[in-house]
Design a protein with these regions (language model features):
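Glycine- and small/polar-enriched repetitive beta-structure motifs of secreted/surface proteins
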Residues: 4, 10, 20-24, 28-42, ...
């Protein structure tokens, strides 16, 4: 009678031994069907694990506080009667409102009603596209305008007001300093109580100022005053320069 055998390495005896041909090195043999089932099960486990690792996109909203409300996904309202009415908006604080897309309102009664507008501070207000108001009662109502400081105001397009009660009320106007005021187009006023009323005028210093008709004029120094009167068909006729404390340049072309 023929015997079918083979030689394998024994892990127990640490030598080669003669065994039946159906024996294996690592233990009992498995059929092809069993091996395929094991491989298929491993593949399913791999897919399940991969699914767990893939991030999921979830739209969510959150509101907390008496009477707070959110009307769209991806918005947050926190505080009594805080309200958001568009996607990607944030309202934090009592009676805050963020009512246009990407708007942010933070602080008691803060309101951000322009697209991409931000209002931070009690009673702060930001109403125009991409406007920014920072400070209690700060108001930014011009497109791309910025107001920083208590009661500061930036009402002109791309205007900037920095300081308590600073006001930039024309296009591209810049007012820097407590109670500084700029009403001239493209004008700059820097210093406490500085006032730039003329178009494209620059005033620097406490109480320095330019007249409304003194276009293209400069006043530098405490109390410096740039006047002048623009003539028809002469864009530079009113240009005056006053430099020094209480300096005055009142006639066209004065220095």
């Amino acid at each position: 009678m023929n015997h079918i055998y083979k030689v394998i390495w024994s892990r127990v005896k640490h030598c080669y031994v003669v065994v039946s041909e159906i024996a294996t090195n690592g233990g009992k043999s498995r059929t092809i069907f069993e091996k395929k089932n094991a491989s298929f099960g491993a593949l399913l486990c791999a897919f399940a694990l991969a699914g767990c690792l893939v991030p999921s996109v979830v739209e969510a909203s959150f509101n907390a506080g008496i009477g707070s409300s959110v009307f769209h996904q991806n918005s947050i309202a926190v505080g009594d009667t805080a309200k958001t009415t568009q996607e990607y908006t944030v309202a934090l604080g009592s009676r805050t409102q963020a009512t246009d897309i990407y708007a942010i309102a933070i602080g008691d009664q803060a309101k951000a009603t322009g697209q991409g507008a931000t209002a931070i501070g009690s009673l702060s207000l930001s109403t125009a596209l991409h406007s920014l108001a920072v400070g209690d009662q700060a108001h930014a109502t011009g497109q791309d305008s910025s107001a920083y400081g208590l009661k500061s105001q930036a009402t002109g397009l791309a205007s900037v007001a920095v300081g308590a009660d600073a006001k930039a009320n024309n296009e591209n106007a810049i007012a820097m300093g407590n109670t500084s005021t700029v009403t001239g187009l493209n004008a700059i006023g820097i210093g406490s109580l500085a006032n730039a009323a003329g178009t494209q005028t620059v005033v620097v210093g406490r109480q320095a100022h330019s007249d409304a008709n003194s276009e293209n004029s400069v006043a530098i120094g405490q109390g410096a005053h740039a006047g002048g009167q623009k003539r028809a068909n002469d864009p530079y006729s009113a240009s005056t320069i006053a430099i020094g404390n209480v300096a005055h340049a009142m006639e066209n072309g004065d220095i």
